[in-house]
C-alpha cells in the first residue's frame, strides 16, 4: 500500500490540485498546443508547462519574471519566447542557463550591449535574434564570440565592416536570412566565414559574385 501511495504522490503532486479550474483548463489546452500563455505569475505553472506543455505554450509570453524564467530554461528542447520585446540584464542572466536546443528571442528589436554580452554566454546549441535589423560593429564583434549557432535573420543589408566582425563567429553556423542580394565587398567578407553559412533570402546573385565563393569551405 505504501508503494501505491508513493506512486500516486509522484504522478499527482499535491500542488496540482491547487490550480484554479481556469488554470487547469489552460494547461490541458496547452498540452495539446491549443493555448498560449501571455503571462505566468505562478512558478508551478512554468514548471508544469516545461515538462508537459506544448512547445508553443510559452511563445506568447509578453513579460517573464526571473523566478519564472528559472523554470522555463530547464527544457532540453528549443525555448521560443516570441512575445518578449525587451529583456534586462537580470532576465538575460536567467535565460542563458537554457541548455537545450535554440533560444529564440525573435521579437527583440534592440538589445543593449550589456545584455548582448550576457546572451553570448548562452549554454544551449543556438541563439536566434530574429528581430534585430541593425548592428553596430561593436555589437557584431560581441555576437561573434558566441559559441553556438547564431541566427540574425532580420539583419538588413549589413555593410562590409559589420560582416567583417560577424565572420569571426566561432560557432558552428551563421544565418543571415534577410539578405536578398550581395555586393562584392559583402561577398568578400562572407567567404571568410569558416562555419556553415545560411543565406536563404538570396535567390540569385549578381553576375560574377559567385566567383568569390569558389574556395568557400564545403
Regions of interest found by a model, annotated:
Residues 26, 36-46, 163:
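Disulfide-bonded cysteine-rich modules in secreted/extracellular proteins
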Residues 3, 7-13, 31-41, 51-64, ...:
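Concave beta-strand-loop units of leucine-rich repeat
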Residues 1-2, 16, 24:
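A detector of long low-complexity, disordered segments enriched in serine/threonine/proline
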Residues 16, 209-210:
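A generic alpha-helix propensity feature with a strong bias for hydrophobic helices
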Residues 16, 27-29, 113:
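Leucine-biased recognition of intrinsically disordered, low-complexity hydrophobic segments
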Residues 23, 45, 68, 90-91, ...:
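The leucine-rich repeat
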Amino acid at each position: 500500500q505504501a508503494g501505491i501511495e508513493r506512486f500516486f504522490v509522484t504522478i499527482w503532486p499535491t500542488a496540482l490540485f491547487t490550480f484554479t479550474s481556469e488554470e487547469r483548463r489552460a494547461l490541458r489546452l496547452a498540452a495539446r498546443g491549443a493555448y498560449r500563455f501571455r503571462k505566468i505569475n505562478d512558478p508551478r505553472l512554468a514548471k508544469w508547462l516545461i515538462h508537459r506543455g506544448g512547445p508553443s505554450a510559452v511563445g506568447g509570453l509578453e513579460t517573464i519574471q526571473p523566478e519564472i524564467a528559472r523554470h522555463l530554461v530547464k527544457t532540453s528542447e528549443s525555448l521560443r519566447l516570441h512575445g518578449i520585446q525587451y529583456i534586462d540584464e537580470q532576465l538575460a542572466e536567467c535565460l542563458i542557463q537554457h541548455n537545450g536546443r535554440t533560444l529564440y528571442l525573435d521579437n527583440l528589436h534592440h538589445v543593449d550591449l550589456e545584455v548582448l554580452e550576457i546572451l553570448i554566454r548562452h549554454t544551449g546549441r543556438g541563439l536566434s535574434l530574429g528581430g534585430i535589423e541593425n548592428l553596430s560593429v561593436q555589437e557584431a564583434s560581441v555576437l561573434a564570440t558566441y559559441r553556438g549557432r547564431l541566427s540574425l535573420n532580420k539583419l538588413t543589408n549589413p555593410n562590409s565592416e559589420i560582416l567583417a566582425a560577424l565572420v569571426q563567429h566561432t560557432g558552428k553556423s551563421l544565418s543571415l536570412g534577410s539578405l536578398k542580394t550581395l555586393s562584392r565587398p559583402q561577398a568578400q567578407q562572407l567567404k571568410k566565414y569558416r562555419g556553415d553559412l545560411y543565406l536563404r533570402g538570396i535567390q540569385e546573385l549578381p553576375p560574377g559574385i559567385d566567383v568569390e565563393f569558389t574556395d568557400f569551405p564545403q
